[in-house]
Amino acid sequence: MLILQGGGSLGAFACGVFKALAKRSIRVDIIAGTSIGGVNAAILAGSKDAKHPEHLLEQFWLELSESFVDFDKVTFPSASMPKVIEHLLLPYTNFYNYFPTPTSKHEEHYSRANDNGGDELTIRMKQLRSFYSSAFFGNDKMFKPRWIQETALTDPEYFTPTKWTYMYDHLPLVKTLEKYIDYDKLQPNGNPNARLILTAVNILTAEPLTFDSSKQQITSKHILATSAYPLYNFRWIEVEDGVYAWDGGLLSNTPLREVLDVSPVNDKRIFLVENYPKRVNALPKNLPEVYHRARDIIFSDKTEHSVTMSKVITLYLRYIEELYQLIESNMDLTKVDPKQLKRIRKKYKKYKQERGAEIKDIFYITRDEPFPHMYENADFSPETIKNSIKEGEMKTIQALKGQIRSM
């Protein structure tokens, strides 16, 4: 199975991971994801190219990168325009108030904050500009800002931003995905490329929502729900009457537990893609890096307890099975109450069915962060997306080195 974390533009890393798995003919029977991981998972599971879903996933990411608007190349109708849009982003920039804005002196700021050389400064500046490009102009293949002029006639709250509950509309993603996903596959008996599991959260109850292609029809609405992250100002989605959903990353950015719950019988070999590293080698050097590391910890993999409990349950089941076989083989069953024996057999089969899966292997494939930056998950620039795909491929090859087997 393949587990894909959320992480905005960092999701391109997972594209490279799957490319490497495909090149080695490693098949996955379950693909689970949340946020952009859910988008990736849906493309792979429902890909119109059944033989090479990795090709369409890469095309998707390249299409997003081609729609990137370079902030430095835009001519504003008014010199004050960047300041106006910047004001709209105050809820975000106030939360991370140590970061520069597009109208502040970037170089001076980072010269004070870091003394690690020009290369790092150049990369950080590029990440910052890429973030503001996405924040100001959106990406017309994935999401659009609510303040753009074309929405003035259709949005009844356009001129009353104090009533806004979101700042970005990701409905453009629906049209983009139509080129890549055959939704007829994403339903029971739909013959998907893999079973698809997406996660979200019920806004009104805080309860987890799990969308499973083996049990229901997965639609674009479910993909929008799993990628509706409110702290990045995306809109909520009504997935069914009265059920309003946000991004599953609010509960867990690594939907392993959900997969173990819905697929409890078959043994598991797991490929877990980490967009946000659990472990780093050094402490943060300044406030931006403090915020970045805190963000990484919030979104990082927290499934160790789930893995441990799964292994404990496996040990218990083996012990129960030994006792059960001992009873069946050595006891005079004519002396046992038939009803009691039936109850024991029923419970044994139930426990084995509900929690019989064993985790055989977990391959952690983790993205590197040579220059930590809060804005890295909003960098959709072509160079960054292509580099992320290459890195995912390379890191997967390293993770599999000497461990490739038939799966």
Name the predicted role of every residue range.
Residues 1-34, 43-407:
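Patatin-like phospholipase
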